[in-house]
Amino acid sequence: MLPVFINLLRRLYFMRASRESAAYHSLPKEGISMDQSRAPIMEALENFKDMRIVPFDVPGHKRGRGSPELTAFLGQQCMTVDVNSMKPLDNLCHPTSVIREAEELAADAFGASHAFLMVGGTTSSVQAMILSVVKRGDEIILPRNVHRSVINALVLTGAIPVYVNPQMNDRLGISLGMSVADVKAAIEKHPSAKAVLVNNPTYYGICSNIREIVKLAHAAGMKVLADEAHGTHFYFGENMPVSAMAAGADLASVSMHKSGGSLTQSSFLLCGPSMNAEHVRQIINLTQTTSGSYLLMVSLDISRKNLALHGKEIFRKVVDLTTYAREEINQIGDYYAYGSELINGDTVYDFDTT
């Protein structure tokens, strides 16, 4: 009797899921993807909870019942929405409904042609970005002070790095951005390079002249990739350094969890109009998990909504607080919290005051 009962539950579930999927696809899409007050993954999870489906699928904690101690620690709400891919909730590898809509909303919020929800951290985003544009033997121009994910991507692809050595600030002991002249020289010396990678900003808040670098690279037929692990707020704050998408970059990896409010390990990969989004998705699917965490995805969805609606206000307050903190620290004596006074129009073209 148990197999019959299970099959009956499955039939009832998929009948309802099919109706909901059909209802979604019958909705007019114009305007929906622009409504930044929506969070489609969150909405789908709320609806899913109301369906009260008996779980015969992974994960094995069965929405918390199978692991009381973990449920007590994380909370029932968290365990209830830690679920597997299914029709009402879409599929991260090949999204067609709510995840696809969340991607469209993110792309609109960030000013990109397409956005991918990444659940392997910005490390996986950076690696997918590089894998999308270079292969074994191709050259890629990049600064020496890149993240280890970039180096690992070079190992995976077999691409050849052409390093641009950033200048150093000897007083602070930190590396700066790439000089436009040095990037231009690298492009001229390596005209067959496929791409230029830029940190926007560096870990220390230093920004190169990414607009000019984009112009130089595109004129030479090269793609521009931006590691924006620390630059989420550039897209939403006022009087911030220019974002990679606004500067015309082709791909950008954005650590939403670092300064955008989502859960640790969640990120976005942004595409400009020159990129084939489906090709990029294929590359992502080479390495990204087939068991995408809905906790991470819904955190991206909700955080994007929050920044799209309230980002200016949030980061205006952040700038005010950091400016106050910097001024107070610099009055103590023997301490120096550096700021926009480092800007020199080249290796420090702009500075992230947050």
Language-model segments: residues:
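N-terminal "arm"/small-domain region of PLP-dependent enzymes with the aminotransferase-like
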Residues: P28-S97
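Hydrophobic alpha-helical signal peptides and transmembrane signal-/tail-anchor segments
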Residues: L2-L8
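Conserved PLP-binding active-site segment of the aspartate aminotransferase-like
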Residues: D352-T354
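Short, Lys/Arg-enriched N-terminal segments with co-localized hydrophobic residues
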Residues: Y13, R19-S33
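Conserved PLP-enzyme active-site core in the AAT-like
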Residues: I41-E46, R52, L70-F73, H94, ...
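Conserved N-terminal alpha-helix of the aminotransferase class I/II PLP-enzyme fold
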Residues: M79-G121
